[in-house]
Amino acid sequence: MARILLLFLPGLVAVCAVHGIFMDRLASKKLCADDECVYTISLASAQEDYNAPDCRFINVKKGQQIYVYSKLVKENGAGEFWAGSVYGDGQDEMGVVGYFPRNLVKEQRVYQEATKEVPTTDIDFFCE
């Protein structure tokens, strides 16, 4: 039995590493500029550093610019989070979309209003 487990365990680890994991949902709805949440809502500036607690979030340094793509609808006393990606030259997080606390940033420029309320999906909280 132990041999079977030892043979099975590396395969399970490989599958998880290749496919990633689905994390808990932070909210059931989000606000977007369009139905598919692909258009940028705004450009925001980080007011302080933020270290991501897990793979759903992005690390942010004070002063970095962040493109905002969606805003989670706050539920039952949970934190208010937005999804976006860091903008800048040579940043490790550049191009990676993740969540960050709304109170961490100040919107500098609004491109489109976030008026479309859409349900979140499992892929919104997927980690590679």
Curated annotation (Swiss-Prot):
Keywords carried by this UniProt record: Disulfide bond, Secreted, SH3 domain, Signal
S-S bridge residues: 32-37, 55-127
Cited Pfam families: SH3_2
Domain of life: Eukaryota
Chain ranges of the SH3 domain: 39-110
GO (cellular component) term, any one: extracellular region
InterPro entries registered for this protein in UniProt: OTOR (IPR042801), Otoraplin_SH3 (IPR035554), SH3-like_dom_sf (IPR036028), SH3_domain (IPR001452)
SUPFAM superfamilies: SH3-domain
Stored PROSITE patterns: SH3
Coiled-coil residues: none
Signal peptide: 1-17
Transit peptide as UniProt keyword: no
Keyword Heme: no
Compartment(s): Secreted
Family to which this protein belongs: Belongs to the MIA/OTOR family.
Name of the protein this chain belongs to: Otoraplin
Native source organism of the sequence: Homo sapiens
UniProt lineage: Eukaryota, Metazoa, Chordata, Craniata, Vertebrata
Gene: OTOR
